[in-house]
């Protein structure tokens, strides 16, 4: 029943302990091996890779992560972001635009009345209503 939780917890513990052990192994000075018993040091040297390889692999992984983050940022900005003149930057796919050819009919019928959430005004019409027309149309 709880096998996934145990799996993820054990994976987290193994990865975290490996990371901590690798960082400690790469930071420890070489003179520390002289104070410890030779049997223990020889066993560790057989298990762990050389210190130069650990630092090299850490550097390669860090540069790989940096390139991945920069690549994802560029992909998001170039591919996933819609252009500024696209209608999807203002409305969503569920929006229904009100289109009237005559501006006076549009103003009288749609501009200053509630849309009840069924129709959306286009961006140009909203800008015209806010900044171009006088407040004289509000009395009609």
Curated annotation (Swiss-Prot):
EC number annotated for this UniProt entry: 2.4.1.198
Any GO MF annotation of the entry: phosphatidylinositol N-acetylglucosaminyltransferase activity
Gene Ontology CC: one annotated term: glycosylphosphatidylinositol-N-acetylglucosaminyltransferase (GPI-GnT) complex
Segments on the Lumenal side according to the record's topology features: 34-52
Quaternary structure and partners: Component of the phosphatidylinositol N-acetylglucosaminyltransferase (GPI-GlcNAc transferase) complex composed of at least GPI1, GPI2, GPI3, GPI15, GPI19 and ERI1. Interacts with GPI2.
Note: Present with 752 molecules/cell in log phase SD medium.
Protein name: Phosphatidylinositol N-acetylglucosaminyltransferase subunit GPI19
Organism: Saccharomyces cerevisiae (strain ATCC 204508 / S288c) (Baker's yeast)
Lineage: Eukaryota, Fungi, Dikarya, Ascomycota, Saccharomycotina
